[in-house]
């Protein structure tokens, strides 16, 4: 990510009266050479680490619709107050995020359904996944099944090798931009450093076209 678009260089309010706000903030984010367009067009190739390529994938179909730059600045300030390096703050954020996802459990627009947590937890307990195995959901939505699997697998982590297996334990695919973004965030909240969820249509590729690496 270019230096000017890193959070610390534009979002943090240093209380010196220089923080971006109002129309200036909206232009910085939405402009032709702004934040969103830059992240949508980051150079990515087959050798790009997953932790970097995921940024382009997340922003590829996203737009920023807020019209009030002052309100947007207030939201940014609230987010910046969260210390993601602090276990308590991270846990609190995770609880809030879980609450947001619960609000999406009823049927949404276009016939979308969000699977209740109780059901995903039950199915994972039935499957009994083990570290070293892969747990996949290829219509992953907001990541409910994957995070239930992570909660189950996290209890098995005892060593550094276990932690590495935990980081690579789940894979997913999701076509719609909003659920995809929510699923990425959901895995980050569950301590997955580079979520392996692809932004693609699982039904668009024939089984015979998959390679061994896939």
Task: Outline where the language-model segments fall.
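Conserved S-adenosyl-L-methionine
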Residues: 112-213
């Amino acid at each position: 990510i270019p230096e000017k678009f890193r959070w610390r260089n534009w979002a943090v309010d240093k209380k010196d009266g220089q923080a971006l706000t109002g129309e200036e903030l909206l232009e910085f984010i939405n402009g032709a050479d702004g934040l969103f367009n830059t992240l949508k067009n980051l150079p990515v190739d087959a050798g790009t680490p997953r932790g970097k390529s995921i940024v382009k994938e997340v922003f590829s179909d996203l737009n920023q619709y807020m019209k009030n730059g002052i309100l947007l600045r207030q939201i940014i300030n609230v987010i910046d107050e969260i210390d993601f390096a602090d276990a308590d703050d991270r846990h609190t954020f995770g609880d809030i995020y879980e609450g947001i996802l619960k609000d999406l459990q009823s049927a949404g627009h276009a016939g979308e359904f969000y699977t209740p947590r109780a059901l995903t937890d039950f199915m994972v307990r039935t499957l009994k996944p083990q570290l070293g195995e892969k747990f996949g959901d290829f219509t992953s939505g907001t990541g409910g099944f994957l995070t239930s699997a992570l909660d189950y697998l996290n209890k098995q982590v005892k060593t550094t090798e276990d932690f590495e297996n935990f980081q690579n334990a789940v894979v997913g695919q999701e076509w719609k931009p909003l659920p995809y973004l929510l699923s990425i965030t959901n895995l980050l909240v569950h301590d997955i450093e580079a979520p392996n969820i692809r932004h693609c249509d699982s039904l668009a590729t024939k089984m015979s076209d998959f390679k061994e690496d896939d």
